């Protein structure tokens, strides 16, 4: 029976196998036939259709019924086929945002699954649920590398699931499942779902050898290093730590997981072994300069193969230079660096890590490489010049550098023929670390520079004072115990310009026989060592006989004026009391005479007079002298500085490169020599820094005898002059009371009023006037007037007339409510008269005047800002005068004071009197806003617009909207927002850019322009003056600012209200001439960049373009044509020329006194890269510190977001200050641009051990705790989420969050980043995050090693990127210029400037094309 049963089963099995084989055979045959047929049909094509992604059903995904089937934060999503899939946040890839739906402006999305996932699986895409991104389950095993924290398993884990029913567990061990005795081991039980609310802490345990239950030592619900629970990490693992593993720990380990709310019970088992290791002994390392030999012995018989890994310890991380496995003794390691520390890691080769130890050694030293040249520059401290030399350690120091030697040697550039020794300037007194070596070996012990005295491997020394007319070459050596390096001859030099002689001898006076003149003899002309002398001026100071020379100012400080003004001023009694005396230029010569006579009006024969005025303003006036006075004076020597210093060839053995030096600015000079063109001296004096003047002391005073007392002049002085003075005093007192009571006189005596007005006009015309200034002289004129705290500007401004014309309409009490200020009245002759309403005689008044621009090219209406009572009148004026453009140069409120009533609506249609105003559009920019309105007059809109009833019903928008479209007008309002009352803008760039935009509008050129500030006189008058003077400059190549402002004041009183505004007119025009319009449209930027990159000899510009409006030259082309010619023969590109324009500056550099204080010196990494006092970040006071307000950081005004440019911390103390700044400024975004390998541990302000660690800065009383919450590594940057708590600030909530973006694509030895694209991506990410912080006004902190170089590039590109997004315009030059004015050492290299252009051009090319 049993046999039959076996036979029956065997038969069934054979039949089944036969059937299966047959089916496989026929199926294979059919497939082969089909394949052959397809091959014939597709002979020319070999394309294979890819596998179709599998659906959820094909993958066997369980269908969920509700969210109860899903893990914590999971959601059950049903597809079109009704199949439900659990989705959860944990299954999302790293690129998916954690949160979503917060930004109402740009709703954030959850992106897509990665490409690999979508190519294999056709499952629902990520979506937003409860403000969290949820994703479909994973299906591929997850590989965890040995370096991936916190697990470091070097193994695979289960794919993440979202359905509770998919619960599974896997057992793993670290570092291995087979280890040596004594090793610390961690066993893991890792599940594939989120355990929150599903798996309890005690529901997972380990069972050893099937009998011993061992509880986990750590679980996902426990905090890690004080942070939040780890349940939200990517993997959920229970851990069993086994310290000092023994053989008794060997065996099988089963992980068992039981779900608390269901009957799910899953397990996984692994085998774990503890064994005894083999060892090696007597391992030795024998190093030389370039290699090392490693030998060892093995225990227990045959040679044992080991693994060796050699790490060079030149930084905190180290670099692996040798790594091989399964090596036997001996081993030779070659190509090592001399005098370099190394660490040899020795380990077993059987994978069980039976042993692991290290061996440290250092290779032998040899002579170092030369030091690396960093930079050389000339610095101007205000009192003297110094040469700053910067260098870095050699590329291969080959040992410990014990000394550096620096030689700064200055040779004459232009010799006067005498044998002058080279100058060896000493190190500046404030820096005791440095010394200038003269090359004498006997002094090398004393003149070496010890590198220990410097904080890092960047060295900087200053040498001075420098002598004029010198070329200082720089050479640096490095020395270690093996010897001294070859010299590093720097390619850059410190070149000093010409200067005045060190001493000018005092002239000797001689009295002439006629007692009405006197002579001067000159013992010896000054030497030309400091530069060729171009002119000699003889200055004379007349004084009353009883005035002593002791009260005179120094000869170089006395005010110079005309002959008549000097005598008038110096003879006043008040001049002696106030010690205020003037001097005048009597004679001038190209060559110094041996003797000359003053007062005879005759110049020394055969000697030419100077063709250049003193200070470009004062000519010689050798007029007859007055007798009875005392005369003194001095000799002035003028030396013209060279504007350019041409390059010299180094390779031919000539002088080393000479680099251009601008004394007014600490920048790297450019190598130049004096041009050989026969340029006259006076043309060379228009260089912005001006010529140098040397002054002698006052010569001994000489007294001219008085005339007879019976002479007519004596009678005049004794009798008539006192009477005239009394008459002038009485007239002044009378006019004072007349002015005080002017309103009474104008009411009761109209005739007297007219006479008074006429007299005032005629009297003001008698004041001193100032002529037109050529365009080329505008910068020089500004510099000259700006000296001595704007003395000449103040004198010119005080000469402006104050017209007192009739203001009857403004003075009426019925119109008092329509005036914002009592002293700002509208002249009757030029006031705007509105149409009267219902016969009301006072309804035609508004405080506004017609203003004619230069030669009446435009018509302005200068108005006060509307008050609440005049908003309707304001719009009525716009309608009646047919104005289509309003220019507003004030803010609604300034310093908590209303400057202007808000006269426009933002959203709803609004009625102002008889004018309907409908908002059409608006846009906001950094310095201005543009609004458009459609307005209509009620009387011209037809009877159906306004319904019967009161005005309140008019607000019914549906009734009004669309009724007056045919009768409406489009009005533009350009609102400049960066100008405070009674002041001038800090920088002219924003206003000029705003004005360029206006000058391109037809509404600005062809219709009346309504312009207002608050009073309608100060900022309004300044704006009109600049615009009109631009027209005059373009038409006549000159500007008569004084005359035009006088004409303005004839049309409206007090136009240009302050000296500061008057000075700004000059400054704006001067900078317009110096820099031109560098603002480009985005669409033209690439072509503009290509033109700049071309050599000037290959490009030319045509200026034949005509304006389509009035036939004149268009403003854009005219502005370009006003600058110097764009076609030169020097071979430089336009970009290089534009970069050199950055060196031009009308003002002196700002001070950095606070950074130079003794207590702050150690807080600066580089002495030249410190914040200006005006823009430095001021820290709040700290208890226990006398002065703790300083940090090397500067405020930078941004476009939408402000910035702080800071240097990297230099110590733990400055790292604490860095966090104090972050807390005080409420910073949430930090950008780090320096290479982390350059940082020492004491400089880092974040935990260096990565995610989950913390660090502490400060003292017990004042401290900050910083925690690294997470760390994400990307291709070119690292994102760290940091959390900090300030101990001394109880008002600040704990655990404030800061995101740090650490850019890794910028090598420390590179001037610019490796990739413009990677930096642009980082900028976009930073700005996108900053814009997502709703309502945050906190600045973005950007820091690098010196706080200027890399930070300047990042901020510059950020500003340019934001502006091209908002305005579609780019201005690299002015953006860089603005940054340089906020912090020193920004954009000192041409490569940095060129990189900004290239980065924007590449971005625009990819974005707009």
From Swiss-Prot:
Disruption phenotype: Mutants have a reduced size and a loss of both motility and fertility. In addition the pharynx and the intestine appear to float within the pseudocoelom resulting from the accumulation of fluid. The majority die during larval development with hypodermal ruptures. Simultaneous knockdown of clr-1 and egl-15 rescues the thin body morphology of egl-15 mutants. The keyword Transmembrane helix applies. InterPro entries: FN3_dom (IPR003961), FN3_sf (IPR036116), Ig-like_dom (IPR007110), Ig-like_dom_sf (IPR036179), Ig-like_fold (IPR013783), Ig_sub (IPR003599), Prot-tyrosine_phosphatase-like (IPR029021), Protein-Tyr_Phosphatase (IPR050348). It catalyses: O-phospho-L-tyrosyl-[protein] + H2O = L-tyrosyl-[protein] + phosphate. Expressed in muscles, hypodermis and a subset of neurons. Expressed in the AVA neurons, with high expression in the anterior half of the preanal ganglion where AVA neurons contact the PHB neurons. Disulfide bonds join 189-255. Residues 276-366, 372-502 form the Fibronectin type-III domain. Residues 793-1072, 1135-1403 form the Tyrosine-protein phosphatase domain. GO terms for molecular function: protein tyrosine phosphatase activity; transmembrane receptor protein tyrosine phosphatase activity. Possesses an intrinsic protein tyrosine phosphatase (PTPase) activity. Regulates egl-15 activity which is required for hypodermis-mediated fluid homeostasis and protein degradation in muscle. During the formation of neuromuscular junctions at the larval stage, negatively regulates membrane protrusion from body wall muscles. Plays a role in nicotinic acetylcholine receptor (nAChR)-mediated sensitivity to nicotine. Regulates synaptic levels of nAchR subunit lev-1 in the nerve cord. Promotes the outgrowth of the quaternary dendritic branches of the PVD sensory neurons. This is Receptor-type tyrosine-protein phosphatase. The gene is clr-1. Residues 23-712 are extracellular. Belongs to the protein-tyrosine phosphatase family. Receptor class 2A subfamily. Residues 159-267 form the Ig-like C2-type domain. PANTHER family: RECEPTOR-TYPE TYROSINE-PROTEIN PHOSPHATASE, TYROSINE-PROTEIN PHOSPHATASE 69D. It is found in: Cell membrane; Synapse. It comes from Caenorhabditis elegans. Residues 32-53 are annotated as: Disordered. Changing residue 1013 to G: Failure in quaternary dendritic arbor formation of the PVD sensory neurons.
